[in-house]
């Protein structure tokens, strides 16, 4: 159509009449190839089956600069709309859990709850390093909207470094748009366990069991301030005074410090070897 308009200098109406096609068809412009977007959207939908197009758009906008209208259109064309059922859980296969070899490869999150003597309910938000078993944060508050969750995580990152991934359940605080956008910004992989499968976050479940058995069930909290004080004291004892059988009966803090010392020593040895190799290579090149 455009070629005819340019070649014969005719009007759009005249050309459409001669070709017997509607003017709307004459104005049609083919869309860009969406195959790359479709493939990535299918992949993201498999990884996050309970995410709608708005949350999936956060990934695609970050990776490809795609606007939300295009994501919505392609999402609907692919038939990826999330079903609104609550009785059945959509199960998905998790990747086999990798063997952890260093701190900050994976953190684990979960919540516990209790009540003060005055009847005020509160929640406890815990953060663990799955390798060192250290409790990195144990925050007490009456509620944990997603912005408070990310604030706690950023303080933990400032103290311990950034994790590669975070394992958690599918609670609303941990699947919100804000939390997802925060993880994308920080380049942290989110590992959401399957609904009804708490054993997929076994380390955190074990920690929560100890927290309840040794602190929440045995302490009388007069108010939130008292709860924060007693739970913080329990966290210190858990990290620095209690040996762990899987850590050769070292405390979690001892294990983390010894790992860091060994890692630093190994790095220095490798640097020394590299300098020696560079010196030998340089000497060999100077020989006649």
Stretch-by-stretch model annotation:
Residues 2-4, 20-106, 197-198, 251-261, ...:
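Basic, flexible linker segments flanking DNA-binding modules
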Residues 186-188, 209-288:
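C-terminal domain-tail junction helix/linker
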Residues 65-128, 134, 147-155, 159-164, ...:
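Mobile-element integrase/transposase regions
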Residues 9-11, 51, 66, 222:
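Residue-level signal for the short linker/turn that defines the boundary of a DNA-recognition helix
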Residues 15-16, 26, 41, 56, ...:
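Mobile genetic element proteins and their domesticated derivatives, centered on retroelements
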Residues 32, 168-183, 190-212, 223-232, ...:
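RNase H-like two-metal-ion nuclease catalytic core shared by retroviral integrases
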Residues 1-19:
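Helical coiled-coil/dimerization "stalks"
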């Amino acid at each position: 159509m455009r070629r005819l308009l340019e070649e014969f200098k005719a009007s759009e109406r005249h050309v459409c009449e001669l070709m017997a096609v509607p003017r709307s068809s004459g104005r049609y412009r083919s869309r860009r190839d969406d195959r790359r977007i479709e493939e990535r959207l299918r992949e993201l939908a498999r990884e996050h089956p309970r995410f709608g197009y708005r949350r999936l758009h956060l990934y695609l906008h970050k990776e490809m600069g795609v606007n939300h209208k295009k994501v919505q259109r392609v999402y609907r064309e692919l038939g990826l709309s999330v079903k609104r059922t609550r009785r059945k859980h959509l199960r998905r296969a998790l990747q086999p859990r990798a063997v952890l070899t260093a701190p900050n490869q994976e953190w684990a999150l979960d919540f516990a709850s209790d009540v003060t003597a005055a009847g005020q309910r509160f929640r406890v938000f815990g953060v663990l390093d799955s390798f060192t078993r250290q409790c990195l944060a144990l925050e007490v508050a009456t509620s944990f909207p997603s912005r408070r969750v990310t604030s706690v995580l950023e303080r933990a990152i400032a103290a311990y470094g950034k994790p590669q991934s975070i394992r958690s359940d599918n609670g609303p605080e941990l699947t919100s748009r804000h939390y997802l956008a925060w993880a994308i910004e920080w380049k942290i992989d989110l590992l959401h366990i399957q609904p009804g499968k708490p054993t997929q976050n076994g380390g955190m479940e074990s920690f929560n069991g100890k927290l309840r058995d040794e602190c929440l069930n045995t302490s009388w909290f007069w108010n939130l301030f008292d709860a924060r004080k007693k739970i913080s004291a329990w966290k210190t004892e858990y990290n620095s005074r209690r040996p762990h059988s899987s850590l050769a009966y070292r405390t979690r803090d001892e294990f983390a410090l010894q790992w860091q010392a060994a890692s630093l020593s190994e790095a220095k040895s490798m640097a020394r070897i590299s300098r020696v190799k560079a010196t030998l290579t340089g000497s060999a090149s100077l020989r006649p």
